[in-house]
Regions:
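Gly/Ala-rich phosphate-binding loop of Rossmann-like dinucleotide-binding domains
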Residues: 7, 11, 116
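Hydrophobic positions on the alpha1 helix immediately C-terminal to the Walker A/P-loop
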Residues: 2, 6
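Conserved catalytic-core segment of NTP-binding enzymes
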Residues: 94, 98-99, 105-196, 201-205
Length: 235
């Protein structure tokens, strides 16, 4: 839910925002933003066919999830997946956006390399959970974006699911997945640490209901606004 909530935060700050769900094999943004029933339509411009993106909370969204049955396993080889992604990127009728957030799957595979080669990325934000096995993925991600042939600025790291605070014990923090692994790595390699996001029930409920918790939960909105302000300041 980080991408959806971050996008909505940027929108509440007055920016025009679009989201491209680049997680071809496991798209979720259309569900998180309440657009599951959207049926894409096409339009022509200058003799070229374009897809009209979904509109949700005054944001634009394009996802492969609009074109597949949610119960079907997507068994595409790498070339087929990357070609689909190129179409979603280049043949969507995006409006005049200030930010296009591209939600990528974990790892450093074909999807990431396709995005890097197809569009000039202004920066990468890497999301991790605190445990060491997750931080190992962060290490690979940072190294990929920093590679001399890639050279995409790493704007920072977000630590998601950082701790849990029960309502009945508001002064207690329980570090269920370990403590501060992503923060420690960010400090070690000189990458900005953008902030922590705790485990909050409203975030999970919002992901399921299609209503991001930003704008509903003031505590969650505060976490995301601090992160969004740091990202904007770095660009």
């Amino acid at each position: 839910p980080v991408t959806a909530n971050l996008a909505l935060t940027l929108r509440t700050m007055g920016y025009r925002v679009g989201i491209l769900d680049a997680d071809i094999y496991g798209p979720s943004q259309h569900k998180m933003l309440g657009c599951e029933d959207y049926i894409p339509e096409a339009m022509q411009k200058d003799g070229q066919d374009y897809i009209i993106p979904a509109q949700s909370m005054d944001m634009e969204l394009m996802s492969i999830g609009f074109f597949i049955n949610p119960n079907d396993a997507l068994m595409w080889r790498g070339a087929m997946a990357t070609n689909a992604l190129k179409q979603l990127l280049h043949q969507t009728m995006w409006g005049g956006l200030d930010f296009l957030l591209i939600d990528m799957p974990p790892g450093t595979g074909d999807i990431h390399l396709t995005m890097i080669s197809e569009i000039k990325l202004d920066g990468a934000v890497i999301v991790s959970t605190p445990q060491q096995i997750a931080v190992a993925d962060v290490v690979r991600g940072v190294e990929m974006f920093r590679h001399e042939q890639v050279n995409v600025p790493v704007l920072g790291i977000i630590e998601n699911m950082a701790w849990f605070t029960p309502k009945e014990l508001p002064d207690n923090k329980y570090y269920i997945f370990g403590k501060g692994g992503a923060r420690a790595y960010a400090e070690e390699v000189g990458v900005p640490f953008l902030g922590d996001i705790p485990i909050v029930q409203s975030i999970m409920e919002g992901s399921e209901s299609g209503q991001p918790s930003v704008g509903v939960d003031a505590e969650v909105e505060r976490y995301y606004r601090e992160i969004a302000q740091k990202i904007v300041a770095s660009l």
